[in-house]
Amino acid sequence: MTNFESVGKFMETFGQEVKTKPEIPDAKTVELRIELISEELEELWDACKDKDIVSIADALTDILYVTYGAGHAFGIDLDACFEEVQNSNMSKLGSDGKPIFNDKGKVLKGPNYFKPDLSKYIK
């Protein structure tokens, strides 16, 4: 069972809707999902400021959890989307097969980069 599937099981067990078709949920659900993600991002920021690695691990895991929950609330298969984005990200290598970075360390797009096509999962 993937992490995404595990969160779906949690949501079903606790009476939360798990959509099987992509769609925008009602405003209350959208607001809840955004608030949950925002809260966990704030916890990560606080943990980083405190240099508390255990709290950082907790916040990062919670960010994944609530993001997977949002995927289910919107009926988006995040496992499939992740695989598509992963393949796209791996296409960012330079023509010499090496990564290209900007001055902040961000990986840049190489000549063989292709944009992920998430539309095929939103049907």
Describe each PLM feature range.
Residues M1-L60, L64-K123:
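Flexible "arm" and connector segments at domain edges
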